[in-house]
């Protein structure tokens, strides 16, 4: 957009939400646009989109964080499996209390009782908060890959993949494995004209990630990754398609 002939002088902010933005994209936005600053928000339908916000210089300095809690109207806490609040830096489930929270799910009393406890909405997201109050979303609880007992965040692996200059789109997901339970799979779209092998990708990622988190299976696609109506990548479809492909190859 910055290199086009369109007049974007009135553009003041470039906000994102619904999914993590590749960290290096934040710096590119800041350096490319003279006036517009990047930002990201975290919230859910159940909280009427209220949660945390990261914008401007704070976001550029801390691009992996979804920001600080929206003041006055929102309380945040990170809880462990025992329901107790986790200390700074420790991962757990993100819970939000706010007068903007919905009261429950229509005609779904069991789901309501599970998600809304003592005024706190249990988001189903894994995250943590640092000593300065910045919130970090690690992944959905349901999307954490458990490989041989080790927890792997899809979002963290995706961030490492996106740091490669030839990567345009990436999605990471768990695939069934008889020995380890789950293994890491990745679907990737490269920039036009770029070429890469799975082994070359793993060598690059090994400089940024623990060895057990590296993708065991990598698919390079010529077409864009499928997306749902909200614009999020349709991981469930990718996971089903590639799991079926692997099962058929056995």
Give each language-model segment a name:
Residues 20, 54, 60-107, 115, ...:
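Adenylate-forming AMP-binding core of the ANL superfamily, especially NRPS adenylation
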Residues 39, 218-221:
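General small-molecule cofactor/ligand-binding pocket signal
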Residues 24, 28, 93, 98, ...:
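AMP-binding/adenylate-forming catalytic core of the ANL superfamily
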Residues 240-250:
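Acidic/polar alpha-helix N-cap and adjacent early helical turns
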Residues 1-61, 71-75:
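Gly/Ser/Thr-rich phosphate-binding loop
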Residues 13-16, 172, 219-220:
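Hydrophobic/anchoring residues in structured secondary elements
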Residues 18, 43, 67, 125, ...:
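Active-site glycine-centered loops adjacent to acidic/histidine catalytic or metal-binding residues
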């Amino acid at each position: 957009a910055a290199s086009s002939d369109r007049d974007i002088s009135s553009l003041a902010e470039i906000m994102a939400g619904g999914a993590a933005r590749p960290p290096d994209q934040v710096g590119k936005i800041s350096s490319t646009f003279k006036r517009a600053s990047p930002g990201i928000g975290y919230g859910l339908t159940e909280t009427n989109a209220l949660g945390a916000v990261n914008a401007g210089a704070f976001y550029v300095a801390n691009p992996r964080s979804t920001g600080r809690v929206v003041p006055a109207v929102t309380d945040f806490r990170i809880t462990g499996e025992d329901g107790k609040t986790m200390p700074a830096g420790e991962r757990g489930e993100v819970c939000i209390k706010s007068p903007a929270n919905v009261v429950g799910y229509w005609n779904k009393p069991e789901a309501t009782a599970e998600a809304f406890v003592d005024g706190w909405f249990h988001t189903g997201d894994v995250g943590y908060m640092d000593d300065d109050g910045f919130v970090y979303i690690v992944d959905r609880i349901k999307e954490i890959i458990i490989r041989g007992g080790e927890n792997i965040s899809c979002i963290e692996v995706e961030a490492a993949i996106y740091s490669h200059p030839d990567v345009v789109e990436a999605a990471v997901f768990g695939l069934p494995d008889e020995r380890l339970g789950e293994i890491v799979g990745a679907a990737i779209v490269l920039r036009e004209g770029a070429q890469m092998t799975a082994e070359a990708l793993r060598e690059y990622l090994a400089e940024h990630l623990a060895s057990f988190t590296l993708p065991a299976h990598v698919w390079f696609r010529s077409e864009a990754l499928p997306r749902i109506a909200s614009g999020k990548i349709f991981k469930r479809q990718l996971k089903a398609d590639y799991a079926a492909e692997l099962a058929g190859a056995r």
